[in-house]
Amino acid sequence: MMDNEVLDFDIGVGVSSGGDVDDDAIDIEHHALDDDDMLDSPIMPCGNGLVGNSGNYFPNQEEEACDLLDLEPYDGLEFESEEAAKAFYNSYARRIGFSTRVSSSRRSRRDGAIIQRQFVCAKEGFRNMNEKRTKDREIKRPRTITRVGCKASLSVKMQDSGKWLVSGFVKDHNHELVPPDQVHCLRSHRQISGPAKTLIDTLQAAGMGPRRIMSALIKEYGGISKVGFTEVDCRNYMRNNRQKSIEGEIQLLLDYLRQMNADNPNFFYSVQGSEDQSVGNVFWADPKAIMDFTHFGDTVTFDTTYRSNRYRLPFAPFTGVNHHGQPILFGCAFIINETEASFVWLFNTWLAAMSAHPPVSITTDHDAVIRAAIMHVFPGARHRFCKWHILKKCQEKLSHVFLKHPSFESDFHKCVNLTESVEDFERCWFSLLDKYELRDHEWLQAIYSDRRQWVPVYLRDTFFADMSLTHRSDSINSYFDGYINASTNLSQFFKLYEKALESRLEKEVKADYDTMNSPPVLKTPSPMEKQASELYTRKLFMRFQEELVGTLTFMASKADDDGDLVTYQVAKYGEAHKAHFVKFNVLEMRANCSCQMFEFSGIICRHILAVFRVTNLLTLPPYYILKRWTRNAKSSVIFDDYNLHAYANYLESHTVRYNTLRHKASNFVQEAGKSLYTCDVAVVALQEAAKTVSLAMNKEVRRTMANRHFKASSVTGGKHQQEVLAQPEPEDEMDKKINQLRNELELANRKCEAYRTNLLSVLKEMEDQKLQVSIKVQNIKISLKDNL
């Protein structure tokens, strides 16, 4: 072979500028990065491949071309460009079985152009264990050592002609090379081709995740080695693709939030910045969400499984449940970066918006990153994984078991949902694993290790507002069902989002109306049922009534009597083996049942009610009436200035003026739109109406202010009064006083509302005390009668 044989191995990304090689005028650059600092993007050709006597070879033909030529680097081998040399060495490395990277370079002091490069085996050198570097950053996941001091390399120099000449080649490696069926795992040989990118884009737009997309690619190409990249590469590409895709629409999101805040200063939103100055995660909460949290923020659900748009951008609502058992919002977020730091920022931001009052319990998806963030921000809250999410995963992970054993689903359900104690669950779980030979199943082992955060028997001692883990996800998803789906983009999102909120608000108003105007039908003569019907909302009373009627089939008998503490065994007739045990404190009138329904849901169970029946306790003790379930759940709350102002604004803008005007406007539009002529007339009428409303507002404010000045001046005497009336104030001064008057009126309204709220609170407390006294008197009379 000729000493100066030229290989035109141009990859189509340009040729470095020429320059004479002068060893006395050279700077040296080193690029020996640690593995942690290596770029994710591989060193691979992306344009035309090898160009020789046989013509052009495209990237998918490059390996074949290299195999045909069977070239090996040698001193004196010449290339058209630095990039061509890099591509050649990388192709050689792929054929041999190692990965490459750029190690060092030399630049000309004259013009700064690169005139020498060294490409090395990726295992060249050793890991940089600089003490200061490791001290400055916390290493959470130590990486394996991959540098072993390999000397294999290829050095090239630029000639006067502009071509690049091999000036040094070390062939031997000090480590084993990778076999051909594993070469695609090496970093420098992983590349997502154009057709693969197109397929990924299509599947991503259809809502598929990286794992399912990789499965489709492997099937399409006939094996993972032929795909040419890994699932991590696919995930990184999708993340970058998503980031680029939303850049154009993210401004719409910010504009919307700014406008909402401008319309109502109590609208809360926050945007997390990123290191590259791009927009990060976004959180917002309207005044109603903040007020609802004041009443119902004892338990919260954070759901990231609801993917709202074509970029699979996680729309993550914070939700709870109101006194009608309906899902309500406590704020929403778009999570662009699903990292622990992002979730920590989000939870802290949400907590600040909610006046820094953490919930008693919080439910999230089964995710290790979210769990770490929860532990950091809510260390005192009980964290639960969504059982619905885990059961859905179970169907995916154990699909072969479901198909082979139809009885598995029923057995799994009984084990998880119907066991009454920890011991029963443990025994049933391992019996299930043995029956279906699943002892070694990794996923089942993983969820078993997390059992205290999703299996009901471990969670019943904590309040979750009776949001069943199975029904929870259904109810939250139904909040936006019919409005938001996988094809919704950001430009459409908020219009549909607002429609969903409006629909949910109407349902809440309807439930309030039904509670106040549709008394429930009583099924027993029990004073307790009548009492509950007057206290609970309609929906919660129906739930209580179900438990009360259920006591008719249960018998309660004493199992142990320890003076003030009596234990009762409660069971259906003939089902003593299914008995529950209720411990009743006679002096405090408190009972605890082994089913822990009250602790979990806040609704008293039929077992305790059965004990109350046999002990002649005719009314519910106050301890068992949670205010959050009553029709007065939103009353008697002492507001701070911020929440009071937010609540006043919300009541005025939504429940009174907005609904009234919307109803009248709807009828107006329906009639006016029947013909072109009536439509034109309606437009003119609306324009005139807008002017009239504007004039009326100014006139009303000015009249109010004039009356105020008249009254104030009357105190100081008639002469001063005449001077004030005779000298009109400048427009700018008038506007300032108008604004001042508006602020004073708003403050007066807030104070009046606060006084009214406090008065209602006092009256309600008096009624509660009166009821408690009546109950105690009645119980004393009953006890005296029994003793006689």
UniProtKB/Swiss-Prot annotation:
Q: Which compartments is it annotated to reside in?
A: Nucleus
Coiled-coil positions = 731-768
Q: Which GO terms describe its biological process?
A: regulation of DNA-templated transcription
Q: What does its record list under induction?
A: Up-regulated in hypocotyls by far-red light treatment.
Q: Where's the FAR1 domain?
A: 87-179
Domain named MULE is located at 299-395
**What is an example of a GO molecular function annotated in this UniProt entry?**
zinc ion binding
What S-S linkages are listed for this chain? none
Give the keywords, sorted: Coiled coil, Metal-binding, Nucleus, Zinc, Zinc-finger
Classify the source by domain of life.
Answer: Eukaryota
Q: Name one Pfam family in it.
A: FAR1
**GO CC terms in record:** nucleus
Q: Which InterPro entries match?
A: FAR1_DNA_bnd_dom, FHY3/FAR1, MULE_transposase_dom, Znf_PMZ, Znf_SWIM
Similarity comment text for this entry? Belongs to the FHY3/FAR1 family.
PANTHER family, from UniProt? PROTEIN FAR1-RELATED SEQUENCE 10-RELATED, PROTEIN FAR1-RELATED SEQUENCE 5
Q: What does this protein do?
A: Putative transcription activator involved in regulating light control of development.
Protein name as catalogued? Protein FAR1-RELATED SEQUENCE 5
Organism source for this protein? Arabidopsis thaliana (Mouse-ear cress)
User: What taxonomic lineage is listed for the species of origin?
Assistant: Eukaryota, Viridiplantae, Streptophyta, Embryophyta, Tracheophyta
Gene symbol of the encoding locus:
FRS5
